């Protein structure tokens, strides 16, 4: 891994870990109210667009956990998902030249979150295909 890539990965990991430790139940509730904003962020072109399907699955998993439909999820997974999605929703840099760098950082945070929670996401997807579908 090149030095700039390693630095970005380390920064993204630090950011995700820091934010995950601070997630509260109120943060989960606030995130679940911002579905439309997430659709905009992941629906546009750019580094986040490639995560659109995973973002929808991650959001649905958190929503189903929160509503009690899918209670098997560890809090650490919920916190990590809320932290990553919340990071994507945080305001971009006010300096236009840094906006692209912000998006790349957001993509790195999402990639780390998805990687860290791949087992939980796969299990949730299996649960969905067994016929228990979220509303």
Go through each PLM region and give its residues.
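Terminal, membrane-proximal amphipathic helices
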Residues: 1-79, 112-135
């Amino acid at each position: 891994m090149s030095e700039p890539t390693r630095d970005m990965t380390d920064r993204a990991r630090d950011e995700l870990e820091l934010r995950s430790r601070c997630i509260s139940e109120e943060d989960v509730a606030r995130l679940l109210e911002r579905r439309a904003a997430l659709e905009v962020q992941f629906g546009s072109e750019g580094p986040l667009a490639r995560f659109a399907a995973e973002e929808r699955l991650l959001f649905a998993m958190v929503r189903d956990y929160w509503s009690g439909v899918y209670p098997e999820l560890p809090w650490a997974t919920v916190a990590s998902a809320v932290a990553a999605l919340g990071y994507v929703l945080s305001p971009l840099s006010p300096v236009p030249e840094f906006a692209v760098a912000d998006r790349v950082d957001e993509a790195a945070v999402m990639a780390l979150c998805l990687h860290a929670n791949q087992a939980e996401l796969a299990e949730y997807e299996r649960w969905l295909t067994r016929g228990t579908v979220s509303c």
